[in-house]
Amino acid sequence: MSHAVARRQEFAADNLAARKVGAEPLIEGLKRIHGAAPAFDSYWRSEVLPLLNSGFRPPIAEGFNRFSRADEIARVIDKQVAHELAVGKADPYDTHPSLRERIAALEGFDRRGETRDEAPAVSLLTGVEVLEVDLLRTMSAEAGNLKPIQWQDVATAVYLPLWTQAAEWYADAFQGITLEHLPEAITQENGIASRLRPKEGEKLDADRRKAKAIFVTGAALSVLLDRHGWRTSVQPGEPVLLEHDSSIVDPFDVVGALAKGTMTAEAWRTLCATAGISALELRPASAASSPALE
């Protein structure tokens, strides 16, 4: 009974909002909420938490705006909204009506003359950074000690150090491998995966070993290209990209594609030749003997 009452209250609130600001802005806002809400968990886990765990505090609201506008994420959000509009139905235990039901209840409003303001809702707030710090303090008392960081700086300050650490830990797995021979090294039985020595307490079955090999090889490739003057870009919702002149490489995607066979060795070698990186050695030059082998 209480859930049914809550749903009626939501309909009443929607009716009031439509009379105050117009049905069209309300409908568009509801669509954005229903599309973006499922995406926020992915944004938080994949984009925000790695920075918080490294001691940095990015602009969270700004980052989610970027994340939700990224091409692939925007397609997923649009698909989610389309699904809700097509088959969405409230469960008896839901406190809110479905998106389809809420929009249907607004169809009777006259939308002529309504104006649309495309500014995000966060623009109505002042002191967003302070509010974000307060939010983080509800999760950890140490939130005030986090260093502010802008999204354009996360590659250099956070990810490259993490990738360097991973590449150097498993450096011996890359011994003698140049980039032109990466296709064989990532696919052959005696390649990179077989050379990985687990850390203390780490268990690597065949699948985990393969996944680990793809990740650490992508990390090593990222570090290598960055140290040879490539520009590294890590933005919310976007793939990792390294760029130099007209060449663009998504290191983790490329290594995964080579491992799965969806990118041919010939295509990779052509890319390497064009970029002049064929002879570069994958093993980090700064690495001593791998700690995993000591």
Regions found by a protein language model. Give the residues of each.
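Cytosolic-facing loops and C-terminal tails of multi-pass membrane proteins
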Residues: 1-6, 11, 15, 19, ...
